[in-house]
Design a protein with these regions (language model features):
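A detector of single, family-specific signature residues
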Residues: 1-148
Length: 148
């Protein structure tokens, strides 16, 4: 079934672009993300694309104060899973493009101490990068997205 999925995903150049350019993505996961979220032209900016995955933080306003809350989970749970799995795959990389993501996550964990929150933040950065890659054709710059 994997060969069949790869054959079907190969018919869409956007899926191939995600699988080749983005760290941590295989052809199946790229196909899942593209199938769940559709064309990035549907979203007016990268924040809207990230919001469709449910990876953006929720907020609560009361008494003139705004509090950041946990992620909204308002989007596609399958796409959210794919982006977090891509980050977890990068955490296993010691060399190559995933190593930059790993270094950023480790640096943030030393500062914030909560690994799950850092993984979600990295997944949101990947989601925004996918939107820029497909909507504008802009190459994903790991050093800009994940400075260490």
């Amino acid at each position: 079934w994997r060969k069949e999925v790869e054959r079907l995903c190969g018919e869409f150049p956007e899926v191939q672009t995600i699988a080749v350019e983005m760290p941590g993505f295989a052809m199946q996961m790229a196909g899942l993300v593209y199938g769940e979220l559709g064309s990035p032209g549907r979203y007016h900016k990268e924040k809207a694309y990230a919001k469709a995955t449910g990876l953006t933080p929720g907020s609560r306003k009361t008494g003139g104060k705004e509090q950041q809350r946990c992620i909204s989970r308002a989007g596609s749970r399958h796409a959210r899973w794919a982006f977090t799995r891509a980050v977890i795959a990068c955490l296993r990389c010691k060399h190559g493009p995933g190593a930059q993501v790993r270094a950023w996550v480790e640096k943030q964990c030393r500062r914030q101490k909560c690994k799950r929150k850092v993984i979600v933040a990295a997944a949101r950065k990947l989601a925004e990068g996918v939107w820029r890659l497909l909507a504008w054709g802009e190459a994903f710059d790991l050093r800009k997205a994940f400075p260490t």
